[in-house]
Swiss-Prot record:
InterPro entries per UniProt: Integrase-like_N, TACO1_YebC-like_2nd/3rd_dom, TACO1_YebC_N, Transcrip_reg_TACO1-like, Transcrip_reg_TACO1-like_dom3, YebC-like
Xref: HAMAP family: Transcrip_reg_TACO1
GO terms of molecular function: DNA binding
Superkingdom classification of source: Bacteria
Protein name: Probable transcriptional regulatory protein FTL_0929
Biological process terms in GO annotation: regulation of DNA-templated transcription
Subcellular location: Cytoplasm
Keywords, in A-Z order: Cytoplasm, DNA-binding, Transcription, Transcription regulation
Source species taxonomy: Bacteria, Pseudomonadati, Pseudomonadota, Gammaproteobacteria, Thiotrichales
Gene3D superfamilies: 1.10.10.200, 3.30.70.980
Family: Belongs to the TACO1 family.
Length: 248
């Protein structure tokens, strides 16, 4: 299937990733640790841990670092005080936003998340206010230049739900979240190394934005992602290649 240009959407403002690399690794390690604490250190018996490991590997985390996080989680440690919290709300232009957190202080967290929404012209909503607009799925993204036919054959045989080829040649492989890590492993074994891979909440309908609104939404997402206890931020904003180039 053909789709709109998505390459720049994989992670908006891609150039900022290097500066945020340490923070990204911290969030990935936290997810691995909590997944191991809740479901045990055996990835074959713990789908959440398996998915967390696949995402970490896609972000070039070393196997030694991953193993240390698993051992830490499986052994208990300070992660026992961390709880998972989800917040939902609306950003500028009515964009739907989901914020997943891991925190040891729920009151502090909700206060700072609410502040970020309010300062950006949005508002924090109630549980379920926007979640119905999203579907949880795995997305494995490849840069332009990959052999589309070969990738499609391997991905579909491995159990992928859909494959989208975008106008710029980038490709997204969509999976059931439970099959995400297995399909990712098969693709790696066959020589297909992704640019990004994660289990995410994908919006069924995207919100189209003008340049000014898109810039405000990006700023809000950046504020939320910069909070230490925020693990992931999802939105239904359609950050097109054109918008990102205009914003710079």
């Amino acid at each position: 299937m053909a789709g709109h240009s998505k390459w720049a959407n994989i992670k908006h403002k891609k150039a900022k990733e290097d500066a945020k690399r340490g923070k990204i690794f911290t969030k990935l390690i936290r997810e691995i640790t909590v997944a191991a604490r809740l479901g045990g250190g055996d990835k074959d018996a713990n789908p959440r841990l398996r998915a967390a490991i696949a995402t970490a590997l896609a972000n070039n985390m070393s196997k030694d670092t991953i193993e240390r996080a698993i051992v830490k989680g499986a052994g208990g440690d300070e992660s026992a005080n961390v709880e998972e919290v989800r917040y939902e709300g609306y950003g500028p232009g009515g964009v739907a936003i989901i914020v997943d957190c891991m925190t040891d202080n729920r009151n502090r967290t909700v206060g700072e998340v609410r502040h970020a929404f309010t300062k950006s012209g949005g508002n924090l909503g109630t549980d379920g206010s926007v979640a119905y607009m999203f579907t949880k799925r795995g997305i494995i993204s490849f840069a332009p230049g990959v052999d589309e036919d070969a990738l499609m054959e391997v991905a579909l045989e491995a159990g992928a739900e859909d494959i989208i080829t975008h106008e710029d040649g980038s490709i997204d492989v969509y999976t059931d979240p439970h099959d995400f890590s297995d399909i990712q492993e098969v693709l790696i074994e066959k020589g297909f190394n992704s640019e990004n891979a994660e289990v995410t909440f994908d919006a069924e309908t995207k919100a189209e934005l003008d340049t000014e609104t898109a810039e405000k939404v990006m700023a809000l997402i950046d504020k939320l992602e910069d909070l230490d206890y925020v693990q992931s931020v999802y939105s239904n904003a359609n950050f097109t290649q054109e918008l990102i180039e205009q914003i710079g």
